[in-house]
Amino acid sequence: MKIGLFIGGAGSAGTLHGQISQIVEAEKAGFDSLWAAHIMDIDVMTMLSMAAEQTTRIEIGTAVTPTFLRHPIAMAQQALTVQKVANGRFTLGLGVNHKPVVEGRLGMKFHRPWRHMFEYLNIVHSLTREGKVDYEGEIFSANTQFTMSSLPEIPVLLAALGPRMLNTAGELADGTITWMTGTETLRRYIVPTINDAAHR
């Protein structure tokens, strides 16, 4: 069994160097992974790339990075960069966030979240696995090609609880990230839904 930690919040532990120190100490303590939330003032992917340079073994991931903050091309660029620094230890966790945050803080319309994520994942998937994309969707369009000599594999997890997002997690992602979910819900609903979608 692997054991990981989740960090993200206020106070000294929520500062840039405070979070990096937590990851370094977690590796020393023998934890297998550390997951960081994109909240408060810190760009979590930048922080994780800095922490990756100070660690060698612990797996690191976002739980989660909000998709409304970056175009999927920019997200793929940054994820590939972090994975290069982390030497394969990085997992990208994505989520659409919440309507009060997207509309209240960002001033954007929280419109068709499932369609937003479906198109977003298709673009990120193409860029991180093939290095190129030619996509014209209802919300996003993307046409570009990366010049990296090699593309590091990046596991992608999707924050999902509802049936459409869970199906998308099974079809297009490598799994899900849940929030305040009990074991019975995982056993009876979330795991079977994702597994069914993954095997279609």
Model-derived regions, located:
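Active-site-adjacent structural elements that line small-molecule/cofactor binding pockets in enzymes
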Residues: M1-R200
